[in-house]
Amino acid sequence: EAILGTKLGMSQVFAENGDLIPVSVIEVLPNVVAAVKTVESDGYNAVQLGYGAVKEKHLTKPVKGQFEKAGIDPVKYLREYRLAEKPSYTVGQTLAADIFAEGEIIDVIGTSRGKGFAGTIKRHNHQRGPESHGSKNHRQTASLGARMSGGGGKVFKGKKMPGQLGGVRVTVQHLQVVRVDTARNLSLIHISEPTRLALIS
């Protein structure tokens, strides 16, 4: 099972024994099944979920035709989730936050928040340089390595250097559903999850 949701922020709840539990508040608006794929017709089993409202003027004609063929209202996000067995969903079916029960263990997949071009201190938690005694190497990358054998003058691939931070696919596993609020379409998940639009499975 899987469902799409949007992270609203962090909060905290008290357990019955008095423990304070930090939680991520996930808004799970109704998900609509946009397509169902099977081994017989597509070569694999999958279900395509639609999430979020969107105006038709923002859609291309091929995407608009896909919604018209399925007989569903246009949605902003479409995500496909592969299944091991033949799906039991039907096109147009609606999924809500209550597909996961309290105490259930889940995985969360999404794109982490992009933070732009960052240096090695922020990106890789490197140490700062000396702050005084004439040093000008405060936040620089510093040495990329001593002379290498075989000619030197090169930088090994994978060297920790400045670059794009965030904005990549992230999977966080074994999170626990602490509470489900079906009246407000909210799901509270133990510990922080780093994405805005999340696929909960």
Predicted features along the sequence, with ranges:
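Basic, glycine/proline-rich low-complexity segments that contact nucleic acids
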Residues: E1-I3, K7-E16, P22-R179, S187
